[in-house]
Each structure stands twice: as C-alpha cells, then as structure tokens.
Amino acid sequence: MNSTSDDNPRPALRALTPLEARVLGVLFEKQHTVPDTYPLSLNSLAAGCNQKTSRSPVMNVSESEILDAINTLKRLSLVLEGSSSRVPRYEHNIERVLGLPRQSAALLTALLLRGPQTAAELRLATSRLHSFADTSSVEAFLEELAGNDPPRVVKLPRTPGERESRWMHLLCGEPSAEQLRGAALSDEPLPPGELEGLRAQQRELSERVERLEALVVHLAGELGVSLDDLKGRL
C-alpha cells in the first residue's frame, strides 16, 4: 500500500471544533468534485459548509464564523490562503500536515463531512474523491489510519441491529463513552441536524437511482432491446 507517511510519529494536533472539521472536509471534497473553482472563495466555502446533502449534521453557519475557523486552521498549517487572486481563496494542506496518501485523506474527508460510516458506506461516499476497488481496500486504509501515531480514526463497536461496525474520525477528539460501549443509537432520538442530514442523504440516493434508471431506459432504446431482455441477461 502506497503511503506518504513515514515511520516517525506526527505531532499531535489539538482537537478540532466541528466547524473546523467541516471546513477542512469541504476543501478536500471540492478540490476533487469541482476542481475548476478550487481553491475556494469564502462564499463557496460557506455554501459547502451549509450544504444540505451529504452532510451530517447539517449546519447553518455564517461567513464570519467560517473565517474564524479558517484563521485557526491556518495557524495549524491545515489551510493555506492563496495570494494570486484579488478575492482570498483557501486550500487544504491535510495530506502534508497529517502525512496521508490521497486514499486515506478521501476516507477521512467522508468521515469529517458525514459522521461515522461503515466501510461499505465509505466506499460509496468517496466515489468522487477516490475509486476504491472494493470494500476490503477501504478497510485496509482505515486500519492504516487507525494505526497511525496518533490514530486518525477508530472502529466503533457494533450497536444492536447493525451488521457492520462504523468508523469515526478522531480529529475532533475521542468518541464518547456511549459510542465506545456500543450503546444503541435507536434508544435515543436523533438530533434535528443529524436527522435532516440522513433525510437529505436518502433524497440524494433516491435521485441518483432515478437518474440511473432513466439512463438504463435510454441505453436500452439505443441498443434496440427491451428492459425485459436486459433483465434476462443479468
């Protein structure tokens, strides 16, 4: 497995705030999903932080709050400000500071933006950041992140009803005692922001399925075959 990290432990960063983690995640995400607009302006960064889809929890933060987070991340060398534009633009420095290869940074980004995820969920969530061959490949990079000094992720105990364990990033500090004990999340109501984030993800997946179904119908028409014929070949 290729890695940009070395054998020496990285200096420990102080725990990030949720907003600082969101800013860092948005910068890495947008670098790979909308490269033409990267580095990001403050306005674009605010839109990414307050995005309703692919975010858990959903946030509603001001540009001044984001700017405070940026200034802190700049002092930690995690964010850099460009000087070649009249409008200030910002880029992440996560791979260099944390000593991570792109694959690991992509997984960490998904955890920063979406909260705890299973390896299978992470493979889907990172599809536009890095294409993992299979879930086993995702798990291998997660295990590497967990073995870093200091560790960057942790594998949470499975909660009742869960088939797979979820992974959580550690950039905002250690998980709570309840998470480590595997307390059943279903016993407590979800916070409004997290519930809205899950609903937004569900809508996003439904829209993606609809687009794929429409594409299949179009391709079937181009090939001159019926959908029943295609189903019979699967």
UniProtKB/Swiss-Prot annotation:
<comment type="similarity">
    <text>Belongs to the UPF0502 family.</text>
</comment>
<dbReference type="InterPro" id="IPR036388">
    <property type="entry name" value="WH-like_DNA-bd_sf"/>
</dbReference>
<dbReference type="InterPro" id="IPR007432">
    <property type="entry name" value="DUF480"/>
</dbReference>
<dbReference type="Pfam" id="PF04337">
    <property type="entry name" value="DUF480"/>
</dbReference>
<dbReference type="InterPro" id="IPR036390">
    <property type="entry name" value="WH_DNA-bd_sf"/>
</dbReference>
<protein>
    <recommendedName>
        <fullName>UPF0502 protein Bphy_5360</fullName>
    </recommendedName>
</protein>
